[in-house]
Every structure is written in C-alpha cells, then in structure tokens.
Amino acid sequence: MSKVSFKITLTSDPRLPYKVLSVPESTPFTAVLKFAAEEFKVPAATSAIITNDGIGINPAQTAGNVFLKHGSELRIIPRDRVGHC
C-alpha cells in the first residue's frame, strides 16, 4: 500500500513548528487531523486543517485524496484562531 506524507505546520505558534506525517493513502483524513492535533497538544475537536492559501479542507475524505487535491504542505489552526485578527 502506498503512503503519502504531509508537512503540517502549527500556525498559532509564532515559531511555526511543524511535523511530517506519513500515512497510508486510504487513511481517513479525520485520523490525520486527530493525530496532528495530539502531536501539537491542541484539541482535535476544535481544530481545522487548511492549505497554505488558507483554503479549508473537508476531513471527510481519504489522506490520498487530500494529497492529490492540496499537496503535502498543510497548516493546522485551533478554531479559536479562525477569522481572528
């Protein structure tokens, strides 16, 4: 089974830490979101993953689909920061 890798950056931290995750293509993206949130110690239930262009990603698809549509560089944001100026 093929794997896809994502570089996920925590945008709410000024140091912009990131994690590189490699998962099977068929992994539900909700699992990727949950794991990334746990790695950054932010609540998964109130976090969103977006592209570098700021486009939100629907987690109800496979990791392979997300990789094909949006590429490997993504950002995770705690939802209390969504639309925050």
Curated annotation (Swiss-Prot):
Gene3D superfamilies: Phosphatidylinositol 3-kinase Catalytic Subunit, Chain A, domain 1. There is a cross-link at residue 83 (Glycyl lysine isopeptide (Gly-Lys) (interchain with K-? in acceptor proteins)). CDD domains: Ubl_UFM1. GO terms for cellular component: cytoplasm; nucleus. SUPFAM superfamilies: Ubiquitin-like. There is a cross-link at residue 69 (Glycyl lysine isopeptide (Lys-Gly) (interchain with G-Cter in UFM1)). Residues 84-85 form a propeptide. InterPro entries: Ubiquitin-like_domsf, UFM1. Coiled coil: none annotated. Pfam families: Ufm1 (PF03671). Keywords: Cytoplasm, Isopeptide bond, Nucleus, Ubl conjugation, Ubl conjugation pathway. One of its GO terms (biological process) is protein K69-linked ufmylation. It is found in: Nucleus; Cytoplasm. UFM1 precursor is cleaved by UFSP1, promoting its maturation: processing of the C-terminal Ser-Cys dipeptide is required to expose its C-terminal conserved Gly residue. Belongs to the UFM1 family. Interacts with UBA5. Interacts with UFC1. This is Ubiquitin-fold modifier 1. It comes from Bos taurus.
